[in-house]
């Protein structure tokens, strides 16, 4: 039994080590498209207007969390994950930004911290959200 368990551990470790998801010899360059408390400056429309120039130098742009938060913030206290109208702009502006990046050869990476969440009244009182006809609480 011990040999079977040890074999299983080695197989799982090998699979985990090879499943990192990032190309082995990736030579691209990523730009962080925001800085601390930059929601006044880092509008989706501002980044979109810079997409052509960024495309000459960068392969990926890391953008902040885009869900709706309470008040103006950097996005790390989202109240709603499926509502993309945030301090950075509207969902339509976000989609236009991603398209502009794609058209200029830039990938987009969203910075999402899943366990950072704003509540309604206490630590576990989150608002209900509906996505594709299913309501989540």
Task: List each language-model region with its residue ranges.
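Positively charged n-region of N-terminal signal peptides that target proteins for export
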Residues: 1-4
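Hydrophobic h-region of N-terminal signal peptides that target proteins for export
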Residues: 10-18
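Substrate-binding/active-site clefts of carbohydrate-active enzymes
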Residues: 21-52, 56-137
């Amino acid at each position: 039994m011990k040999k079977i368990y040890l074999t299983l551990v080695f197989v799982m470790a090998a699979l985990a080590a090879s499943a990192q998801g990032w190309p082995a010899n990736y030579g691209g360059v990523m730009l962080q498209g925001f800085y601390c408390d930059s929601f006044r400056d880092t509008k989706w429309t501002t980044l979109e207007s810079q997409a052509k120039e960024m495309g000459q130098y960068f392969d990926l742009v890391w953008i902040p969390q885009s869900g709706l938060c309470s008040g103006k913030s950097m996005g790390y206290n989202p109240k709603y994950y499926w509502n993309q109208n945030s301090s950075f702009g509207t969902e339509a502006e976000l989609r236009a930004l991603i398209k502009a990046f794609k058209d200029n050869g830039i990938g987009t990476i969203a910075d999402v911290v899943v366990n950072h969440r704003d509540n309604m009244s206490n630590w576990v009182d989150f608002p209900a959200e509906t996505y594709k006809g299913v309501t989540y609480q």
